[in-house]
């Protein structure tokens, strides 16, 4: 198995997932494409945690680019052996993957909390509050209650859709980074191959 090619594939996947996380998080600031709710601070508190922008986005780009460049990384070798240097590079990629695990974990946790609490919205009494906070997420299964939020229009659907996307994307990122931790350890211990013609064995 070529551990370097596997790492590079994971890296490219993480870049795409990170960009999607950033886009989903940005959309949370503009319900129905309107900017006034953000300027008036009438958004869910968990929107301001930047889970998709920072956790699933920017923090994910670090391990992504490390993994993408890993296959071309000749490292310095040790004792004149290039193979040793490549194995060290694979082991060091584990640290980058752990950063990715932390970022994606943060994204998943915040998205789950955002889904459980529900959106900040204007209720039928004309007050801005978290209408579904006391339902412990049960409102997700009872769409008939969503009409309790009168403004922003369709805010429940907006929040549920985007937080669900962040939850799914963060979960995929977490799994990929976990796979890279295993891949990096195996690659560091068992060897690293740079092409189909070259492979290092234990």
UniProtKB/Swiss-Prot annotation:
<feature type="transmembrane region" description="Helical">
    <location>
        <begin position="10"/>
        <end position="30"/>
    </location>
</feature>
<dbReference type="Pfam" id="PF05805">
    <property type="entry name" value="L6_membrane"/>
</dbReference>
<feature type="topological domain" description="Extracellular">
    <location>
        <begin position="31"/>
        <end position="49"/>
    </location>
</feature>
<feature type="topological domain" description="Cytoplasmic">
    <location>
        <begin position="71"/>
        <end position="93"/>
    </location>
</feature>
<feature type="glycosylation site" description="N-linked (GlcNAc...) asparagine">
    <location>
        <position position="159"/>
    </location>
</feature>
<dbReference type="GO" id="GO:0016020">
    <property type="term" value="C:membrane"/>
</dbReference>
<feature type="glycosylation site" description="N-linked (GlcNAc...) asparagine">
    <location>
        <position position="129"/>
    </location>
</feature>
<keyword id="KW-0472">Membrane</keyword>
<feature type="transmembrane region" description="Helical">
    <location>
        <begin position="162"/>
        <end position="182"/>
    </location>
</feature>
<protein>
    <recommendedName>
        <fullName>Transmembrane 4 L6 family member 1</fullName>
    </recommendedName>
</protein>
<comment type="subunit">
    <text>Present in high molecular weight complexes in tumor cells. Interacts with SDCBP2.</text>
</comment>
<comment type="similarity">
    <text>Belongs to the L6 tetraspanin family.</text>
</comment>
<feature type="transmembrane region" description="Helical">
    <location>
        <begin position="94"/>
        <end position="114"/>
    </location>
</feature>
<keyword id="KW-0812">Transmembrane</keyword>
<feature type="topological domain" description="Cytoplasmic">
    <location>
        <begin position="183"/>
        <end position="202"/>
    </location>
</feature>
<feature type="transmembrane region" description="Helical">
    <location>
        <begin position="50"/>
        <end position="70"/>
    </location>
</feature>
<keyword id="KW-0325">Glycoprotein</keyword>
<feature type="topological domain" description="Extracellular">
    <location>
        <begin position="115"/>
        <end position="161"/>
    </location>
</feature>
<feature type="topological domain" description="Cytoplasmic">
    <location>
        <begin position="1"/>
        <end position="9"/>
    </location>
</feature>
<dbReference type="InterPro" id="IPR008661">
    <property type="entry name" value="L6_membrane"/>
</dbReference>
<keyword id="KW-1133">Transmembrane helix</keyword>
């Amino acid at each position: 198995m070529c551990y370097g090619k596997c790492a590079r594939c994971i890296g490219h996947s993480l870049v795409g997932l990170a960009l999607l996380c950033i886009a989903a998080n940005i959309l949370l600031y503009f319900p129905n494409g309107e900017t006034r709710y953000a300027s008036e601070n009438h958004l869910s508190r968990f929107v301001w945690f930047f889970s998709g922008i920072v956790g699933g986005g920017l923090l994910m780009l670090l391990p992504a680019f490390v993994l993408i460049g890993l296959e071309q990384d000749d490292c310095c070798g040790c004792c004149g052996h290039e193979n040793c240097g490549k194995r060290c590079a694979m082991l060091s990629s584990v640290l980058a993957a752990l950063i990715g695990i932390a970022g994606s974990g943060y994204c998943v946790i915040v998205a789950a909390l955002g889904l459980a609490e529900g959106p900040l919205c204007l209720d039928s009494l004309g007050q801005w509050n978290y209408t579904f906070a006391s339902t412990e997420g049960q409102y997700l299964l009872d769409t008939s209650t969503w009409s309790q939020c009168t403004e922003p229009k369709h805010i429940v659907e907006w929040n549920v859709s985007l937080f669900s996307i962040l939850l799914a994307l963060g979960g995929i990122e977490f799994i990929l980074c976990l796979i890279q931790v295993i891949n990096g350890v195996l690659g560091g211990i068992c060897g690293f191959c740079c092409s189909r013609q070259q492979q290092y064995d234990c």
